[in-house]
Amino acid sequence: CCQPLVYRNKMTPLRVAVLLAGCWAIPVLISFLPIMQGWNNIGITDLIEKRKFHQNSNSTYCIFMVNKPYAITCSVVAFYIPFLLMVLAYWRIYVTAKEHAHQIQMLQRAGAPAEGRPPSADQHSTHRMRTETKAAK
């Protein structure tokens, strides 16, 4: 699952640039472009016009209404998909940390000293490693 030794080979400057460009391009595609093209008003222009005439004509406020397909698409692309990806990423991190903690615990049990012996320097390092890995649990 985790391969920290090949991270530098996988995360090249080009790949980082593509990921960053995607982080900016996706919001532009789901917000700026459709709003400027009027796609968010398809089917509800009559409602917007009614609201304009009901308000004071000297007012400086902005009426922003969107149709259901646009609202659903934006919600899915901008919230639900990133939310799902973050939950999956954190789940993988959690599972990996639990596996590593279990492996460390098994290694520590395999090297446990017999009763009655004084602890050696190796046992001190094992105890230190145990306390340092509690964060992974």
Swiss-Prot record:
Q: Which Pfam families match?
A: 7tm_1
Q: Write out the ranges of the annotated region (Disordered).
A: 112-137
Task: State if Membrane is listed as a keyword.
Answer: yes
Q: Alphabetically, which GO biological process terms does the record hold?
A: adenylate cyclase-activating serotonin receptor signaling pathway; chemical synaptic transmission; regulation of appetite
Q: Which residues are glycosylated?
A: N58
A GO CC annotation given for this chain: synapse
Q: Which residues cross the membrane?
A: 12-35, 67-90
How this chain sits in the membrane, per its record, is: Multi-pass membrane protein
Q: A GO molecular-function term, please? A: G protein-coupled serotonin receptor activity
What is the annotated localization of this protein? Cell membrane; Endosome membrane
The answer to whether UniProt assigns keyword Glycoprotein to this entry is yes
**InterPro entries named in the record:** 5HT4_rcpt, GPCR_Rhodpsn, GPCR_Rhodpsn_7TM
Tell me which UniProt keywords the record has, alphabetically: Cell membrane, Endosome, G-protein coupled receptor, Glycoprotein, Membrane, Receptor, Transducer, Transmembrane, Transmembrane helix
Q: Which PROSITE patterns match?
A: G_PROTEIN_RECEP_F1_2
Q: Which family does it belong to?
A: Belongs to the G-protein coupled receptor 1 family.
The annotated subunit structure for this chain is: Interacts (via C-terminus 330-346 AA) with GRK5; this interaction is promoted by 5-HT (serotonin).
Domain remark in the UniProt entry:
Specificity for G(s) G alpha proteins is determined by the length of transmembrane regions 5 and 6 (TM5 and TM6).
- Function according to Swiss-Prot or TrEMBL: G-protein coupled receptor for 5-hydroxytryptamine (serotonin), a biogenic hormone that functions as a neurotransmitter, a hormone and a mitogen. Ligand binding causes a conformation change that triggers signaling via guanine nucleotide-binding proteins (G proteins) and modulates the activity of downstream effectors. HTR4 is coupled to G(s) G alpha proteins and mediates activation of adenylate cyclase activity.
Q: What is this protein called?
A: 5-hydroxytryptamine receptor 4
The upper taxonomy is: Eukaryota, Metazoa, Chordata, Craniata, Vertebrata
Q: Which gene encodes it?
A: HTR4
